[in-house]
Amino acid sequence: MQLNSTEISELIKQRIAQFNVVSEAHNEGTIVSVSDGVIRIHGLAECMQGEMISLPGNRYAIALNLERDSVGAVVMGPYADLAEGMKVKCTGRILEVPVGRGLLGRVVNTLGAPIDGKGPLENDGFSAVEAIAPGVIERQSVDQPVQTGYKSVDAMIPIGRGQRELIIGDRQTGKTALAIDAIINQRDSGIKCVYVAIGQKASTISNVVRKLEEHGALANTIVVVATASESAALQYLAPYAGCAMGEYFRDRGEDALIIYDDLSKQAVAYRQISLLLRRPPGREAFPGDVFYLHSRLLERAARVNAEYVEAFTKGEVKGKTGSLTALPIIETQAGDVSAFVPTNVISITDGQIFLETNLFNAGIRPAVNPGISVSRVGGAAQTKIMKKLSGGIRTALAQYRELAAFSQFASDLDDATRKQLDHGQKVTELLKQKQYAPMSVAQQSLVLFAAERGYLADVELAKIGSFEAALLAYVDRDHAPLMQEINQSGGYNDEIEGKLKGILDSFKATQSW
């Protein structure tokens, strides 16, 4: 087919009219060095702090060092095939993770990708991993409890919704067990949970997920995983990603609980990144901003007022407060709580639960040391009945510890001292609790009432455990309505006191333990 000159000129005019002159501008740079997951890039003049940088192979790095001639970034994922001379691009975006109810019951990695083989996520949107914590005016005081199901914690170291309570102790003292039981106890409370596993073995995390599923708590929980085999960048970012997922519920007038297991490993990962970025080291080779690393994370755990929730949801949710309660875990070395990271986190949080190796090895589990454990704001959140009955327990244990130390040097003790020692031993025995067996408020209240009112005086020390088990079985069988009433109201008055006394009198008469 031959075209004449008129057709050719018409075709050229048509092409010129349709020609699109839109150009795409992007900030491009070149990798100049790669070492242990840290890359140095030349040419990204307009890069932002914390910006995602697009790498070859659909991977990303995060810009952490902005220098005069180069940018230092950490690679999120494998980096073995990255080499000098490769081209990279700025994205203009800060790292975001998927959030929403569709994540409940799922196991995801730091970037929010599912790793449990249950198919794609049904997320409600994305949220930036780094967010500014709510201000003072947007907060509300902590006055509602988070029940862990442990007698020793709920009675003596109560935790409130929106509080940050540190769990601290050496390895193998039951820190994770305490946190997992706290999650299991929330399965019927309406509190959504987020468990962030940092630098742990994949087999350990798999075991935790299985236990949560067995006890019906996984459906209410998001598990965020950065295993020991993953890069330091992913371990460093995992707590922030988990926090963003928890904030989704807080900002919509719901209650959430987040466990960081553990922040010691996050600090070590951040130290590794900082040293590779050639930042000046400080005490214990940690960088100067390691305090800020944890403070900006833990300050995001808060109870926010109804005005904040209403403004955030644009009027969809009214009259509801939201909360994010944090239980960070710190591992100490040989009980040294005065090390750099432990002292930092102690000063940031609203209290701490100390778990001791000596108590754990002596069979006192949970191995909580009530003498140096404290909850600075949780007392206001305690239910009325627990507040009334727990005061005597703390006093009894304090007196027992003092007398036990004194009695080692004294041969003959008077009757009053012997009674106090005996009572302290029985209370210590009573506070022991098996793993994966959290107790309701009513069950704890009944047991504490028995201890405080002297019902254990004629029970042998070896039979305290069987006495408690038989008592709880007895009330579940014959007095379930009263237990339900206490669980719902948490109140305490003369009528409830009389009923508890009647239950214990009738139970003691059966001698069934």
Swiss-Prot record:
Q: Which domain of life is it from?
A: Bacteria
What cellular-component terms does GO give this entry?
A: plasma membrane; proton-transporting ATP synthase complex
User: Where is this protein found?
Assistant: Cell inner membrane
One Pfam entry name:
ATP-synt_ab_N
Q: Which residues bind ATP?
A: 169-176
| InterPro entries found in the cross-reference section | ATP_synth_asu-like_sf, ATP_synth_asu_C, ATP_synth_asu_C_sf, ATP_synth_F1_a_nt-bd_dom, ATP_synth_F1_asu, ATPase_a/bsu_AS, ATPase_F1/V1/A1_a/bsu_N, ATPase_F1/V1/A1_a/bsu_N_sf
Q: Which residues cross the membrane?
A: none
Q: Which UniProt keywords apply?
A: ATP synthesis, ATP-binding, Cell inner membrane, Cell membrane, CF(1), Hydrogen ion transport, Ion transport, Membrane, Nucleotide-binding, Translocase, Transport
* EC number(s) on file: 7.1.2.2
- Answer yes or no on keyword Thylakoid: no
List site positions: Required for activity.
373
Q: What membrane topology does this protein have? A: Peripheral membrane protein
EC primary class: translocase
Q: Does the keyword Iron apply?
A: no
Reactions catalysed: ATP + H2O + 4 H(+)(in) = ADP + phosphate + 5 H(+)(out)
HAMAP family for the chain: ATP_synth_alpha_bact (MF_01346)
> What role is this protein assigned?
Produces ATP from ADP in the presence of a proton gradient across the membrane. The alpha chain is a regulatory subunit.
Q: How does it assemble?
A: F-type ATPases have 2 components, CF(1) - the catalytic core - and CF(0) - the membrane proton channel. CF(1) has five subunits: alpha(3), beta(3), gamma(1), delta(1), epsilon(1). CF(0) has three main subunits: a(1), b(2) and c(9-12). The alpha and beta chains form an alternating ring which encloses part of the gamma chain. CF(1) is attached to CF(0) by a central stalk formed by the gamma and epsilon chains, while a peripheral stalk is formed by the delta and b chains.
PANTHER family linked to this entry? ATP SYNTHASE SUBUNIT ALPHA, MITOCHONDRIAL (PTHR48082:SF2)
Q: What name appears for this protein in its UniProt entry?
A: ATP synthase subunit alpha
Please name the source species.
Klebsiella pneumoniae (strain 342)
